Amino acid sequence: MQDSKEKQCLIFVRNNANDTADRIEAYAKKSGMEVVETVFNTDKKAGERLRYYIERDVIICVLVRDVVDISMELNEIKAVMTLAAEHGISINAESRGYEPALISYE
């Protein structure tokens, strides 16, 4: 049986970023991924939703325009990226050509 999360991704974008969401969704579909949800970062619940998907291992990656779309706070970005890494989930940024974003522990 094929792993159900094999090609599933989550799109996480800033509030009112409909054009960005559409562009990233088109990239995901072109790359053969299934978008399980597009989350707009409008409030604290958006971050909770992001963590929900990561902690349940239902996706292989999170697609963002840039990692600062996750949060403007560096510690929050690092916490989310660390959680994702612990679950084998990459955070891929459009600004990096959809390469996985890397975290610095300095």
PLM feature spans:
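Short, structured surface patches at the beginning of a domain
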Residues: M1-E106
